[in-house]
């Protein structure tokens, strides 16, 4: 059986190091002797059930670690299920029992070091490049044994669409990018060209060829196929490493770009500058024949540079971008690659690119900012020195990126430990914690305190295009190292709220200087327009988006301000101002005022706010209304609050819930779930937004209906059902936060109970 291990790594591997004694580290290990017959049967049943229902519910319920943790906690749900029939009223007792059931279940899922684990996946483009990298470097069987490979195959099979392709993420329609990557991954893992479960490879290849063959794969796919030797580098738009030698004052310098894009193109520029191609094995030769519609030697690679399948093209290249690519390809790259310039300029450029790669790797303990970047950086390190320590350190951190659930083994974006813990703590605090949750809060508080980033990136970090990180919190753990404004805000909120409680309940308060550092970091991420960015201040002009080469994403070139980040920081600063009114008072007051103006300015005509990190208008409106409420805005004194409330009430479903499709994100307009289905987590978001906007004082019926939907959705063990994806990124990339369903419904019930039963009266 697979077992989730927490906080392990000390002394086991000379290439593994930590800034925090591996607190929060999550790794999976296969133990052939683990588990009773009943437990193994339960795991197999979970796998069978997922596969049989995979067309109806795409995300996993993340059952494997939950079964393990519930057993280790000796969890038994002793509070009976709450039944509410037809028009029956909700009583205080029933609301309390449903809440306590959810809190008990959530508490039992806490890890020993205080965090809440959970799957953080969704995109189907993450696992294959890892397999490609290990195949090219000759380490595939060393890193992944037969059990790993079996679960990887399970994951790929589980998420193949009926048409034979794979979507950009697990709920999307098939696209060339992920269909090609997963097809090649299956072949590398040993599946024959017509083999696989339900003829997976044959069906996938038919999809690829019927859509023009792999010359229509978007640019990132072209890079990986060129590295493998299935595509030619002359068919890739140039990304010369000399870009890193340009003066930083130039507005087009990639050092000013969005952090994820910048770090993605560091190794891509290195690979391009080297024109690296792995060993041409018999399998690669077969793939050349299988995936192209014409003989490999006859392909017009120059023409293929601009090709992209219509299914993949979310951001079509403007004409000016294609003209620039053509100029680079026709004139600049041949010059840079010629002697003696290649010995002088290119050699220096490759050294600079590798210097930046090593810097990012070291400062993230080789987790890297995300998995897309890790795979590319790891390969670049191997090319630079196959026997070097940098590559070996990358190998040691691969387990941190892997996750196992009933749908198989997948590669995570990275972890979401801190993000989940911050929300879980707020849910527990809202529930009026009792004796049985005090230890849970104490452990969570300890995890949050230990996970704060205590230093800035090493050395002259500004010359490496990095921002301060001291005082911040990451999405996952301290070792990751990448500060995020909303993660910092949620963690700081928890620390401040817990500091108001007795230390014998919640443990020692966080050091005040650490809170000051977190405030300093948050303030540094506010733009002139009042909004807060996520990772770094805005450095590039918006017109740089004209050079977005990804095809797949929008808003990929520049950092920008987000409603959710702005609201989270606003709420944290309001609490800080109340507790510590003498620290940077004028700056914080001005910051809050500007943040409010930004949130109000981002409201759309229908009263909603676009959510960049969740789906979508429901998520954004929840954050916006909570932020405005934190500063004292009400339905009566704020038009934005009124319009936001009306938007949510107008989209409430007949069953009392809310349900929004992920298509709202790319379409940038509200789209309900098919059949007007409701989603229990989105219902919780909308419900909390209305409560913070004072809905209980005006009309309780919408809240009662929502609460009834949540309560009647609760499962026997106190958990809630897994439904649609809930996370989002860059408009098209949907994310699976599996622990959301364990946190937000109880949190909403806690807020509902306080708002609806002020005097503990029945409805």
Swiss-Prot record:
GO terms for molecular function: oxidosqualene cyclase activity. SUPFAM superfamilies: Terpenoid cyclases/Protein prenyltransferases. Keywords: Isomerase, Repeat. CDD domains: SQCY_1. Signal peptide: none annotated. One of its GO terms (biological process) is triterpenoid biosynthetic process. Gene3D superfamilies: 1.50.10.20. It comes from the Eukaryota. The active site is at 486 (proton donor). PFTB repeats lie at residues 149-190, 515-556, 592-632, 641-682, 703-744. GO terms for cellular component: lipid droplet. It is an enzyme of class 5 (isomerase). PROSITE patterns: TERPENE_SYNTHASES. Its EC number is 5.4.99.-. InterPro entries: SQ_cyclase_C, SQ_cyclase_N, Squalene_cyclase, Terpene_synthase_CS, Terpenoid_cyclase/PrenylTrfase. Multifunctional enzyme that converts oxidosqualene to tirucalla-7,21-diene-3beta-ol and two other triterpene monoalcohols. Belongs to the terpene cyclase/mutase family. This is Lupeol synthase 5.
């Amino acid at each position: 059986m697979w077992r989730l291990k927490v906080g392990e790594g000390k002394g086991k591997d000379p290439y593994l190091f930590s800034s925090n004694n591996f607190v929060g580290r999550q790794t999976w290990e296969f133990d052939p002797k683990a588990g009773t017959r009943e437990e193994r049967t339960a795991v197999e049943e979970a796998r069978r059930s997922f596969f049989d229902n995979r067309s109806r519910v795409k995300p996993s319920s993340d059952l494997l670690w939950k079964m393990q943790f519930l057993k280790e906690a000796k969890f038994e749900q002793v509070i009976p299920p709450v039944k509410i029939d037809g028009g029956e009223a909700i009583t205080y007792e029933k609301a309390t029992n449903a809440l306590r059931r959810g809190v008990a279940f959530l508490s039992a899922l806490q890890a020993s070091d205080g965090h809440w684990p959970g799957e953080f996946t969704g995109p189907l483009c993450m696992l294959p490049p890892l397999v490609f990298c290990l195949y090219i470097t000759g380490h595939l069987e060393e890193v992944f044994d037969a059990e790993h490979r079996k679960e990887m195959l399970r994951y790929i099979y589980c998420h193949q669409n009926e048409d034979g392709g794979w979507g950009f993420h697990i709920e999307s329609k098939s696209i060339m990018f992920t269909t090609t990557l997963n097809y090649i991954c299956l072949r590398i893992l040993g599946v024959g060209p017509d083999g696989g479960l339900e003829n997976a490879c044959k069906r996938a290849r038919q999809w690829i060829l019927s859509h023009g063959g792999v010359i229509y794969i978007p640019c990132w796919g072209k890079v990986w196929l060129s590295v493998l030797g299935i595509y030619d580098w002359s068919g890739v738009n140039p990304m010369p490493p000399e870009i890193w030698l340009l003066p930083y004052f130039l507005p087009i310098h990639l050092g000013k770009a969005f952090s994820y894009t910048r770090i993605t193109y560091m190794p891509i520029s290195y690979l391009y500058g080297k024109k690296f191609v792995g060993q041409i094995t018999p399998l690669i030769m077969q793939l050349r024949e299988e995936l192209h519609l014409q003989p490999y030697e006859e392909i017009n690679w120059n023409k293929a540079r601009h090709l992209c399948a219509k299914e993949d093209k979310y951001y079509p290249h403007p004409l000016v971008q294609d003209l620039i690519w053509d100029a680079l390809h026709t004139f600049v790259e041949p010059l840079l690659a010629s002697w003696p310039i290649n010995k002088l300029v290119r050699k220096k450029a490759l050294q600079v690119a590798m210097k930046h790669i090593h810097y990012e790797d070291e400062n993230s303990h080789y987790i890297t900012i995300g998995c897309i970047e890790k795979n590319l950086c790891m390969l670049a390190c191997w090319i630079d020195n196959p026997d070097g320590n940098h590559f070996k350190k990358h190998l040691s951190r691969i387990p941190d990126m892997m996750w196992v659930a009933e749908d198989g083994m997948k590669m995570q974006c990275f972890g979401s430990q801190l993000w989940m813990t911050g929300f879980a703590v707020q849910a527990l605090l809202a529930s009026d914690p009792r004796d049985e949750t005090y230890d849970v809060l104490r452990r969570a508080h300890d995890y949050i305190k230990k996970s704060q980033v205590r230093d800035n990136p090493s050395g002259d970090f500004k010359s490496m295009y990095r921002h301060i990180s001291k005082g911040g919190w990451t999405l996952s753990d301290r070792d990751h190292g990448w500060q995020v404004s909303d993660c910092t805000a949620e963690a700081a909120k928890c620390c401040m709220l817990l500091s108001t409680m007795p230390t014998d309940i919640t443990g020692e308060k966080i050091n005040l200087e650490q809170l000051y550092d977190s405030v300093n970091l948050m303030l540094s991420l506010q733009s002139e327009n009042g909004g807060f960015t996520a990772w770094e201040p805005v450095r590039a002009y918006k017109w740089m988006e004209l050079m977005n080469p990804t095809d797949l994403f929008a808003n990929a070139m520049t950092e920008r301000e987000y409603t959710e980040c702005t609201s989270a920081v606003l709420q944290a600063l309001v609490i800080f101002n109340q507790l510590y009114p003498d620290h940077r008072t004028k700056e914080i007051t001005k910051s809050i005022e500007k943040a409010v103006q930004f949130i109000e300015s981002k409201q759309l005509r229908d009263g909603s706010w676009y959510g960049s990190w969740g789906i979508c208008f429901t998520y954004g409106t929840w954050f916006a209304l909570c932020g405005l409420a934190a500063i004292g805005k009400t339905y009566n004194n704020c038009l934005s609050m009124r319009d936001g409330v009306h938007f949510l009430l107008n989209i409430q479903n007949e069953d009392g819930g809310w349900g929004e499709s992920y298509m709202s994100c790319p379409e940038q307009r509200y789209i309900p779930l098919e059949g007007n289905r409701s989603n229990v987590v989105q219902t919780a978001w909308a419900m909390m937004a209305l409560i913070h906007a004072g809905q209980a004082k005006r009309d309780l019926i919408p809240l009662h209906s929502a609460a009834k939907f949540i309560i009647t959705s609760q499962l026997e063990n106190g958990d809630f059902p897994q439904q649609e994806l809930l996370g989002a990124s860059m408009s098209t990339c949907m994310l699976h936060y599996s622990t959301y369903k364990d946190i937000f419904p109880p949190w909403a019930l806690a807020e509902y109970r306080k708002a609806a039963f002020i005097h503990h009266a029945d409805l």
